[in-house]
Amino acid sequence: MERGSRKTRVGRVVSDKMDKTVVVLVEDFVRHPLYGKAMKRTNKFKTHDELNECGIGDKVKIMETKPLSKDKRWRLVQIVQKAK
C-alpha cells in the first residue's frame, strides 16, 4: 500500500493515558440507505503517538499504517488544533 493511498481521518483525542498511544474519536455523517435520514456514526481508533505530544480534546489528523500492536493500526500525522 503506497503512502499516498492510505486512508486519513480527522478526529479528536478522547484518551491519552497510555504510553505512545492515544484514542481518537472520529465522527462521520451517513445517510440511511432506505429512509435517507442523516445519522452520526462514531468510531474510536487507537493511534500511535511517538512523541506523546497529544492531549485530551486535541483535533488531530491520523493515517492508516501497518499493524503496530493488537489494536493499533493508525498513526498520528499532525495536530490540527490544540485543546484550549
UniProtKB/Swiss-Prot annotation:
GO terms for cellular component: cytosolic small ribosomal subunit. Keywords: Ribonucleoprotein, Ribosomal protein, RNA-binding, rRNA-binding. InterPro entries: NA-bd_OB-fold, Ribosomal_uS17, Ribosomal_uS17_bact/chlr, Ribosomal_uS17_CS. One of its GO terms (biological process) is translation. Pfam families: Ribosomal_S17. GO terms for molecular function: rRNA binding; structural constituent of ribosome. The keyword Calcium does not apply. It comes from the Bacteria. One of the primary rRNA binding proteins, it binds specifically to the 5'-end of 16S ribosomal RNA. Part of the 30S ribosomal subunit. This is Small ribosomal subunit protein uS17. It comes from Alkaliphilus metalliredigens (strain QYMF).
